[in-house]
Amino acid sequence: MIWTILHIIDIILWIIIAGSVIYVAFFAIISLFYEKEDHVAEHAAAISNRVTRFLILYPAYNEDRVIIHAVEQFLLQDYPKDHYTVAVISDHMQPETNEILKELPITLLTPTFEKSSKAKAMQYAMTEVQGNFDNVVILDADNVVRPNFLSQLNILCSVYDAIQCHRCAKNANNDVAVLDGASEEINNTIFRKAHNRLGLSSALIGSGMCFSYKLFKENVFKLSTAGEDREMEALLLHQEVFIKYAPDIHVFDEKVSNQDNFQRQRMRWMTAQIQSLLSNLPKIPGAIIHGKVNFIDKTIQQALIPRSILIVLLGGISIIMTLLIPAWCEKWWVLLGMLAVALYITIPSQLRLQSFKKVFSIPGLVLRMMKNILHIDRNNTDFIHTTHEK
């Protein structure tokens, strides 16, 4: 009797974990398919001769170390100066930092929030910054872009109302940063590139985002959690707005480089994932009836087991089963093999060797993530800040 119960538990657990592995493996394979170049936006931009008027928002909470460099680099754009406005929302930054920012050709906002959040900063900016804009770009305070960033976006804005740029690592100074950068590229491959290749919407990532001004203003005031990017994504997909992924428009982002920051970052992400899942689930019946495939897919994403946990969980179960119940172990090794191949495919070739050298750091990081699970509060809307250095 006890063996029957254990076998049932084994099968149920395998099915639950297999769902996450199969999802990752499926989109990893899709990412290998050839994609025709998208010339629609180029033709539309050429015909309309459009020069988009951009509002660039930098929500900056306690970001004194990085914000000045990021803004100075952005101001090197090869785009017409009178067609973009940079607004920094300075929240809890030092007076000395604000004085330097005031000397730059930007709009500096200095709100005072009882409880700070990125959503509140963006809402404040949309209320305070006046002007005739076509599109809004959201960047984090540590983000650095190339001089042709706006010129590239201008082309896509002729066709798409929501664009996610290619956010990639600007630092690889230790094991944590390397693994965080590799994780970002895996997400880019699975949730952005592969999804677009199937005609599905890209996932948003919190920065390097561009929206039509009207669309953003209609939705930004609906944001209320610390996972504002997931909230925005769910709102857009429920409205059937397609999100375009722009792999050639790079936004260089600082990766977390210490375990405490990693734990805080993952705590924020895991809380946002649970909040998003619980918020989306009641809308699923309506989404099914109206054929909102992107919204359904997004809800499935929120139910996936985080990959780092998946790697350690599968590895641990496979070894334990091999030692204790060899007859039940094969299916677990198959899943682990599928996951390993999928991750190999989704990591860019230039990062593979460097990433796999750091694989032994994963268990320690996963342990910190597991600790987070005990502290997740689905009703928590507090902003969990991770510090930046570069």
What are these regions (language model features)?
Residues 87-98, 113-115, 144:
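A conserved acidic beta->alpha catalytic loop
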Residues 29-33, 37-41, 45-46, 301-380:
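Membrane-embedded multi-pass helical conduit in multi-pass membrane proteins
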Residues 68, 94-102, 148:
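Acidic helix N-cap motif at the loop->helix transition within catalytic regions
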Residues 132-144:
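Short beta-strand-to-loop acidic/aromatic patch adjacent to the donor-nucleotide binding site
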Residues 110-121, 125, 129, 133, ...:
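Long helical/loop segments within the catalytic core of UDP-sugar-dependent glycosyltransferases
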Residues 1-72:
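N-proximal low-complexity "stem/linker" segments adjacent to membrane-targeting elements
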Residues 72-83:
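Short, acidic, metal-binding catalytic loop of nucleotide-sugar glycosyltransferases
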Residues 52-55, 85, 231:
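Cell-envelope/extracellular polymer assembly enzymes that use nucleotide-activated donors
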